[in-house]
Amino acid sequence: MTRDIHDHRILILDFGSQYTQLIARRIREIGVYCELWAWDVDEADIREFAPKGIILSGGPESVAEEGSPRAPEYVFNAGVPVFGICYGMQTMAHQLGGSVQCSLEREFGYAQIELVEQSPLFKAIEDAVSESGAPLLDVWMSHGDKVEMIPEGFHTVAKTSYCPYAAMADEERQFYGVQFHPEVTHTRQGQRMLEHFVSDICGCEKQWTPAKIIDDAIERIREQVGSDKVILGLSGGVDSSVTAMLLHRAIGEQLTCVFVDNGLLRLNEAEQVMEMFGDHYGLNILPIRAEDRFLDALAGENDPEKKRKIIGNTFIEIFDEEAGKLTEVDWLAQGTIYPDVIESAGSKTGKAHVIKSHHNVGGLPEDMKLGLVEPLRELFKDEVRKIGLELGLPYNMLYRHPFPGPGLGVRVLGEIKKEYCDLLRRADAIFIEELHNADWYNKVSQAFAVFLPVRSVGVMGDQRKYDWVIAIRAVETIDFMTARWAHLPYELLEKVSNRIINEVNGISRVTYDISGKPPATIEWE
C-alpha cells in the first residue's frame, strides 16, 4: 500500500461540461484522489502530475467545428488509460483517426444502451436484459454530434437505436469512450463504471478516505508552519469551522482564531460561534466588533462584485492588523475549497468567464503580509463535511444550508445599510424557523431571505404603511450547478409571510422567488 494518499491519482481534463466537477466528486467518492484541469494544459504539466489515468469530460462545443477544443496529443501517448465522456469520446475518436458528424437529431435525457461486446468498463453490470439476452443499461444522454466511424483498433461496446457507437474501446491501449454521462445519478450504473475504470483498469488504490485526509492535512500543516503562529478568520460556516478544527488538532495553541462580527452575519450567529468554539472546543478566539468599519467601507456601493471585493479586502486588513498585535504571527489560514480554486482559476486560454468572484480566492490584496495556509483547498464541500464529522463537529452545523462568504452583503441588494441588515436578519430567522417547524428544512438544499431596496404600500389595521420588501427563496439541487425552486406548501408560505410582515416592523410585503438555475443563479448577487 502507498503511504501518500495522492500517489494514485486521476487527471480530469475539462472541456466545459456542467457535469465536470461531478466527475471529480464521483472519483473522490470511490476513494481515489483526482484533479480537474483545463483542456489546454501543457504536456509538461501532465508529465509532472503523472496520473494513473486520464478522463476527458463532456462539453458544449462541436468537434466538427473548426477551432473547437482538443485534448493535448500527449494524452494518447502517455501510456495510461484514457476515458472519454460524451464530447471527450468524440474528440478522442476524431483525434485518433475516426470521424464525428453533426446530426440533425439530438439525444437528450434517458436512453437505454445495449451492450454488444464485453469490456472491463462494463464488467458484471446490467439494468435489464433484451429479448435476445443482451445486457441493457439505463443511461443519461446529452449530445447532438455522434461518432460516425471509430478509430482503428477500437471496437463497438454498446449501441442505441439512434447511436451506433454509444460506447467504444481499444482494450490494448486501454482507451474507452462513452456517449452518455456515467457521472450523473440518472445513469444507474454510472458509479460502477467509473470504479471499474479507476480501480480495475487504472489500478488505483483507495487511499482517499476522511481519516487519511485528516492525517495528511495535519502533517502538511505542521510541515508548512513549523512552530510559527497562525491566525484564522472564523465565521462559524462549514469551511472555516472545519479549518479551525483541523488547525487546532495540528498545532494547538499556535492557532488564534479571529472572529470578526462584520454586521453581515445571521441572527445571534456571533454568540453561537463564541459559545461553540471558545467554550466547548477550547479554541483561542479573539472577537472583533467591526460592523461600523465594514458598513463605512461599503457605503454608497451598489455593484455586487465591488461589494465582494470590499468585504474580502476589509477582512484581510483586519487580519493584518490583528496579526501585527500578536507576536510572531506569519500565517493566515483560510477555508478555501476546491471549487473556489477551480472556478477562480478558469482556463489559461482566457475563455473562462467569471460569474461571481469567490470570497476566499478573489479578494486577496497583492501586498498581503501573511503567508497562506489553506488545508481544505483540495476538497469538495461534501468532503469537507465528512472531514468535519470525523473531527467531531455536530451534524446539524455541518449540514446546514450554505451561507455565502460575504454574508448578508450579497443578500441585501444594492447599497448595504445597518437598517437593511437588521430587517433581513430577523426575516431570514423567521423563514428558517418555520421551515424547521414544518419539517421542510432538510427537504430543500438552500433557503434564505433577500432584502429588496424597494418600498411597497401596505395596510396594518387602519394605518397605511410604505415599507420594504423581502423575497424568500428555497431551492432543490444535487450539485448546486442546476437548481429547481422548491414547491413549498402554500400554507407554509402564508405563515412565513404573515409572521415576517407582523413581527418585523419595516417590512410590508413578502415575495417568493420561483426562478430556476439556470437562468437565474441561486443567490441574487
Curated annotation (Swiss-Prot):
Keywords noted in UniProt: ATP-binding, Glutamine amidotransferase, GMP biosynthesis, Ligase, Nucleotide-binding, Purine biosynthesis
> What's the domain of life for this entry?
Bacteria
Against Gene3D superfamilies, the record matches this protein to: 3.30.300.10, 3.40.50.880, HUPs
Q: What class of enzyme is it?
A: ligase
Q: Does the keyword Endoplasmic reticulum apply?
A: no
Q: What does this protein do?
A: Catalyzes the synthesis of GMP from XMP.
Q: How does it assemble?
A: Homodimer.
Q: What is this protein called?
A: GMP synthase [glutamine-hydrolyzing]
Please give the organism.
Idiomarina loihiensis (strain ATCC BAA-735 / DSM 15497 / L2-TR)
Gene symbol of the encoding locus: guaA
